[in-house]
Amino acid sequence: PGTAAIYSDLGYLLLGLIIERVAGVGLEEYLAEKIAGPLGLAEGILYNPPGKLKKSRQAYFPTENCPWRGKVLQGEVSDENCWVLGGVAGHAGLFGNIESVLGLTAAILEIWQGRRVHPHLPREVLAFFLEARSQVDGSTWALGFDRPTPGSSSSGRYLSPRSVGHLGFTGTSFWIDPDKELVVVLLTNRVHPSRDNNLIREFRPYFHDRVLELLGLV
């Protein structure tokens, strides 16, 4: 402990189980009632999309051709560990459209800045996670969130050092910049039809640079 910063799903998978034990309800229900619900996003940020929507291309784009399940996934979690757990886990499994993800990240920014109150997410708790500094020298990680790495970050060149964000394996990401008062969300299905496509690594920083350039925030 304290010697290296290692990205791992296991801690947040365990955290999801702890939340269920303490709250006395499933993580899916907890998300809907305690986090997304008060923001009006219970139908936009969710686990396990309703069956009737899974095959609607207007609702959920296909992702990868999964050898385990013998089909192209659509409206079904890509992460294998989350799938084994029924599609609900602390580290993976969320679905959302651009409006809902923007709404969630904008709410995080507003709560962080003290401009919005959430009944179950006090600013002090949120700031503890977003502003935490790793005890490991050279690590950019906060608690559950990444920060820009000089010269090599997916956030590009222009977001402030206090920015926080996270990437999704299927080709998604968000970044929240408290100094520029900006949130940037990218939703793609880069694993369709195969997870071998890694061009997203070049596209993400380019995308963020272009967004900030077009907004005049460079």
Model-identified regions with their sequence ranges:
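Surface-exposed amphipathic alpha-helical segments
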Residues: 200-218
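Short, surface-exposed beta-strand/loop micro-motifs that present aromatic residues
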Residues: 170-183
